[in-house]
Amino acid sequence: MAWVKFLRKPSGNLGKAYQAGSLLSLAPTVGLLNEPGQNSCFLNSAVQVLWQLDIFRRSLRALTGHICQGDACIFCALKTIFAQFQHSREKALPSDNIRHALAESFKDEQRFQLGLMDDAAECFENILARIHFHLVPNRDADMCTSKSCVTHQKFAMTLYEQCVCRSCGASSDPLPFTELVRYISTTALCNEVERMMERHERVKPEMFAELLQAANTADDYRKCPSNCGQKIKIRRVLMNCPEIVTIGLVWDSEHSDLTEDVVRSLATHLYLPGLFYRVTDENATDSELHLVGMICYTSRHYCAFAFHTKSSKWVFFDDAHVKEMGTRWKDVVSKCIRCHLQPLLLFYANPDGTAVSTEDALRQVVHWSHYRSGEENMGCGKPIIYKPDNSKENGFGGQTKQKENHKFQTDISSLNRSQMQTSGRRAPVKLSHDQREKIKDISRECALKAIEQKNALSSQRKDLEKGQRKDTGRHRDLVDEVLASFKSGSPPASDGFRQQGNPHLYHSQGKGPCKHDRATHESYTSGKVISSSKSQNLLVPGEKTTGKAKSDSGTGYETDSSQDSRDKGGSYSSKTKSRHRGWKPMRETLNVDSVFSESEKRQHSPRRKSDIGSRPRCSKDQSFNNWPKANPKQKGLMTIYEDEMKQEAGSRSSLETNGKGAEKNLSAAESRGPGTSWQMQRTESGYESSDHVSNGSASLDSPGVEGSGAVMDVGGGKAFSEHIKMNSHNMDSMEYISHHCKDHPEGFRKELQDLEADDKIHELHPESHVQIKSHLIKRSQIGETNDKLFPSASPQTLAREHVYQTNEHKVERPDRSKCSERHNTENSEGTGLPFHVDESSVAGKRVDSNETVSPSSLPSSVRTAGLKPETGPLMFWSQQNITEQGYSDNSLSRELTLLSACNADSCQMPKLHCHRSPPPLPPKKYSTASAPRLERVGLSPDVGVTEAFNTNPSSLPKHSLSPASGPSLEGSPCMTQERDKETIQVKQLAANSYPSSCSTNSFQPDQDSTSVCPNETISLTTYFSVDSCMTDTYRLKYHQRPKLYFPESSGHHSNNSLSQTEQVEGSIT
């Protein structure tokens, strides 16, 4: 035998002290007998590896109390054989005790019966499952947090999986589960190695975990939760830090010749974070495990390799035969290749691992029959017994056991559960007061975490109710969906995401019933439990997942472990089911927007520094639900998206789903610049599969936040910023009403003052013009690609929206004047000086229909002059998500519009008949009365000041205007004529550089032009999707003002002005 080598070494000291069962040997030479007809090699291999696992061996030695089941007690059988390993001097020991216990435990299922061959991987899993039941029988295997449970503290991997569709933004509910073995297909593993070799990458040992993850998720595509037709990969996140990780290799009978390739690809070190999509436990982020055991299969026979820690040598166990292989892993590889041994289970352990804590462990051995009778006495009803009444006392006296049982009844809580832990059945729980007190003592740490979770959940529910009261329109359906998810106890959809077949089928292992037929008896393997049964078995009151105890309140799902449930008894009877809810997925915290925003805050600190004053106060989803901000060290379910968002600037919008992906991808590729990437690529809400681009929310990756000069939120508040971000690509034409100017000559004179003042700004910022020009060129490229995507809205649709918007808000006119004046005054005080634009920059500007200009973003000279929206000339600008360059475009192009519009004789309005197709959801219905002749177009309130306006007071030219300089420009039509001449020159210059046949909608991605007859009256409207971040009164005042409309009186001048604008745009490009 191998131990003889120790005796023969002249330089070793083991010759004097070594004995076959001493502490020095740790029984490396003791084998397990497998007599003919027993077919116990699968069990012998599993037992040998468990004995060689230092963490398991020390933990089992430290645990003294358990629930004993007599002949069916696997815990007793293991302790017995481990004691024999330690003290016996026999070369081989019988494994009859544990074989009988295993057969007795699964007698009703006809598994692991005497004389029948079975699977070593299943045997290993079921041994761990039975150990859990012997230590903590009152706890669900998936929710066990007992510190003394070896199975879940050392072996179990607490995971959750989820799918997120990048096309439509929909996401599946997070599904938590527990794995004891992570199964990998050997075929997929070899394919991944081949792909790596094709990329000319060297297979390094530290990349082994990544290879396993790639092989585990290869071809594992699921359908989109919203049925958009996309195939998406599932992501699995590890929430705890197991000290022993078991990898199961699944061999296909058709590819059994891959033995050599698989063995050569194995590594002796496993980097735990690389095995999963993400790990949330801090201890798991740098956890590196060592290979200490391996079970192999060949020709209907099992054997094992184990690393002996004392001698640092690999030992080969083949039933009763034990042989040392050497200190090098190469020796094991050579043995496997030579004997054609197929690796079946790989055991990776933490070299610094320790035994389990015995703080909440049982102190005495309690027999199952007494434990069962104690349950009946407490009124739980007759349980389904785990073993028939002929169970033996195993040498313990009846009176002694009754005393211990009496004490045990007051020490632990009871569970009326099903007979088979692996059958997946659950039974009600009823706890007495004393038992409830014991549970509090056992799970103090879990209780603290539960209180935090409860507080966070309570605040989230209150915020959700507020958002529900505020919400109208299309978001009402979203609230219903969220609340339905809150009340649902079964997370997965019909497609399940856990409805997997048997993960490991060994066709070459003839061992009775096929494993696929027995898959329903397994509950510990992820592949053996379908989502329906898993979702129904997630709840045990007072308990949480192991990973949950180490994570914060952002994990996103609860297990009813709040303190009040313990105070009330934590019972799960029929009377309290309505009060104590089960696991509830909180998918609000999993939305793409909020996670993407948080990840950008952490990953792009230079952007944060540049826009401290301009950061949006909240994203769309955060304003709707008001969830707490995620901790930078968040370990919850939200983390599943963080890497996704680092690699890709937001998920694609639903345009791709609607058949517009090709054009959209092309435009997104052309607009990678810092000012345009977010305009054509949107991030939808994480749980909402929206088909409307107009309601997508912005993220911190948008250029409005990247800019360094934009100052947002001067006086508008969160509602303004939120509304502007969510109303994207809504573009309408600009109207300038000459009649209104004639009725208010004073306001017109003041506007002329503003024009002269604004003419100087380009002198102060010539570099801004260059930047804007290049930016507009990029926009034109996007427009040329996308101007064919959206058909124009029908006149009926526009007329209908015009009627409802007009009647909805015409009663608010007196208040609007005051509010507009207030915002203008605040913004004027914020800037503190008038601004000026150089007239020479007119030729380089155009009307940018993609940008937003609102009362708060008007030049400061207009606001200081006291010009109100009702008393001055009105302009209507399309709404767009705010960018810094958008501010500059607005401020510069407004001057051109007024120059082309204000003719000295008639001051007519240029008509730009561009219509936006509104989202398909119907608008809010109001009584449709006859529309008055005089209406107003609502100005979109903005909350920023343009970068171009932030000039130095010392550099202002001599044409600077102050509020007192207004009367000096009375009767200045000659100035207007001079400006018109300049505009004509601009027109001629543009005609030489750009064909006049080009229309404005070539620069407008989402627009299409329609020709309107002179006698046809169509109201130009903007569709506002209702947001939860504002009340109806707020929206009535600031977001949908009825517009002032006059029938077209001079078609010649309108066409003239339109042609001017088109040609100026042509000169820019």
UniProtKB/Swiss-Prot annotation:
Composition skew (Polar residues), residue ranges: 414-424, 522-538, 552-562, 674-700, 850-863, 948-965, 1052-1069
Compartment annotation: Cell junction, Tight junction
Positions bound to Zn(2+) 1: 66, 68, 73, 76
Tissue expression notes: Expressed in the cochlea. Isoform 1 expression levels are 10-fold higher than isoform 2 expression levels. Expressed in the liver.
Catalytic residues as annotated in Swiss-Prot or TrEMBL: 41, 301
Claim: Metal-binding is one of the keywords in the record: yes
InterPro entries: Inactive_ubiquitin_hydrolase, Papain-like_cys_pep_sf, Peptidase_C19_UCH, USP_dom
GO cellular component: bicellular tight junction; cell-cell junction
GO molecular function: K63-linked deubiquitinase activity
Residues that hold Zn(2+) 2 according to the record: 132, 144, 149, 152
Catalytic activity line of the entry: Thiol-dependent hydrolysis of ester, thioester, amide, peptide and isopeptide bonds formed by the C-terminal Gly of ubiquitin (a 76-residue protein attached to proteins as an intracellular targeting signal)
Keyword Zinc belongs to the record: yes
Pfam families in the cross-refs: UCH
Boundaries of every USP domain copy: 30-351
Residues the record lists as binding Zn(2+) 3: 165, 168, 224, 228
Keywords assigned by UniProt, alphabetized: Cell junction, Hydrolase, Metal-binding, Tight junction, Ubl conjugation pathway, Zinc
Main subcellular location: other
SUPFAM superfamilies listed in its UniProt record: Cysteine proteinases (SSF54001)
Family: Belongs to the peptidase C19 family.
Function description: Deubiquitinase that mediates 'Lys-63'-linked deubiquitination of tight junction proteins, such as MARVELD2 and LSR, and which is involved in the survival of auditory hair cells and hearing. Specifically cleaves 'Lys-63'-linked polyubiquitin chains composed of at least 3 ubiquitin molecules, while it is not able to deubiquitinate substrates with shorter ubiquitin chains: recognizes ubiquitin chain in position S2 and catalyzes en bloc cleavage of polyubiquitin chains from substrate proteins.
Protein name: Ubiquitin carboxyl-terminal hydrolase 53
Protein species of origin: Mus musculus (Mouse)
